[in-house]
Amino acid sequence: MDMTTTIILSIAVFLGIVLLLVALLLLVRNKLMPKGEVRITINDDKELTVPVGNTLINTLAEQKVYLASACGGKGSCGQCKCRVVEGGGTILPTEVGFFTRKQIQDHWRLGCQVKVKENLKIVVLQSILNVKEYECTVVSNCNVATFIKEFKVQLPEGEHMDFIPGSYAQIKIPKFDIKYADFDKELIGNEYLPSWEKFNMFDLRCVNTEPTVRAYSMANYPAEGDVFMLTVRIATPPFKPDHSSFMNVNPGIASSYIFSLKPGDKVLMSGPYGEFHVKEHDNGNVGPSTGSGTLLPEMIWVGGGAGMAPLRAQIMHLTRTLNVRDREMHYFYGARALNEVFYLDDFRQLEKDFPNFHFHLALDHPDPAADAAGVPYTPSFVHNVMYDTYLKDHRAPEDIEYYMCGPGPMSAAVVNMLDNLGVPPENIMYDDFGGGAPTK
């Protein structure tokens, strides 16, 4: 047997072994992979017949039951919580950190971590069953600050969504390859373009290789019609250590997608989600106070950046819709400079129309533009402004209701300050759809 024949036979034997192993793997996979259909019973009421093999969150979404998810089902936000009272196996290590011992005993799970392999009985919030998905049309998408857009979409004709101010929506993000150079510069605006050019923003590119979803708080309140209105901050890569340019990593997937959209574009949105709502008193009353003679607690909102969204919705609903005039209300908002503050005119007008409402602006540093415009502000971080200008001399800060949404460091500083003032945790409400409320 010559050398050529030996080589050919060796290759043939090798390929035969590889093909045999592949066939065995496919056979084993076919035997081990679950097949067929199972039943999912929801709240002892609704029963679904579904195929096996997918995660619970995706299986339910295919049946138009939408669990909340701010991370696209990656197990990092902890929002897709539900009780799996039958089936589903034991809780996974990836889930444990999101629940207390009592919740684990009560069978709480993350929908993105539960595989549908057998019949399941689950319990979800009733509000989840009211969530719908809509194909919406972009109405406007203009910058309201250097790196923040007001993104507004219209629900389809004939559709209506009931929601409580402070709720959030989810947007479906498709696969894409987006170059920031293709962004519509008119939608960014001449006021903000110099900063974009200074930081070489138009050199960035974002690639998304698989569909996902992201969550954003709604800035609109019900009286503004059948729309979703979000405030979205572009998530840039971190700077290199020498601050010469951005690191070569992907910018934010969802914010890049939203910033690329133009009026007339179609997007898939679902909602409403969330429990960041104004506390109810006296059988559902949030204000005005009832005729019992007892005033409802004072309210303080504190926000920064795109965290403006749910706070605006709550404040506008209480004032413009419910006409609450006998609850003391204060809104503390922090920004780097005056040109980063949006909806300012709305809140200054509220101060004129509602003597019980007060807007407090905190800017990081003295701002000549604010001084020239005659806009009242205090130069400091927002938690310091809250304490120094109001809470320090307040007779009972522990009785106030606090509503908070903004960057993590801001929230942590505010919580620490309120904790030192003796404010109980139940009086501090967070917009926490992104996972992880501030800790002390």
Language-model-detected regions and their locations in the chain:
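Ferredoxin-reductase
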Residues: 139-265, 289, 336, 363-366
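Reductase modules of NAD(P)H-dependent flavoproteins
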Residues: 2-73, 84-105, 276, 320, ...
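Short coil-to-beta-strand transition motifs
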Residues: 127-136, 207-214, 341
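A short, basic/flexible loop-to-alpha-helix module at the beginning of a structural domain
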Residues: 257, 271-295, 392
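Short, charged beta-turn/beta-strand-edge "cap" motif at the junction between a beta-strand
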Residues: 116, 128, 175-178, 271-276
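Fe-S ferredoxin-like electron-transfer domains
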Residues: 21-27, 31, 97-154, 159
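Cysteine-centered iron-sulfur cluster-binding motifs in ferredoxin-type domains/subunits
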Residues: 69-78, 111-115
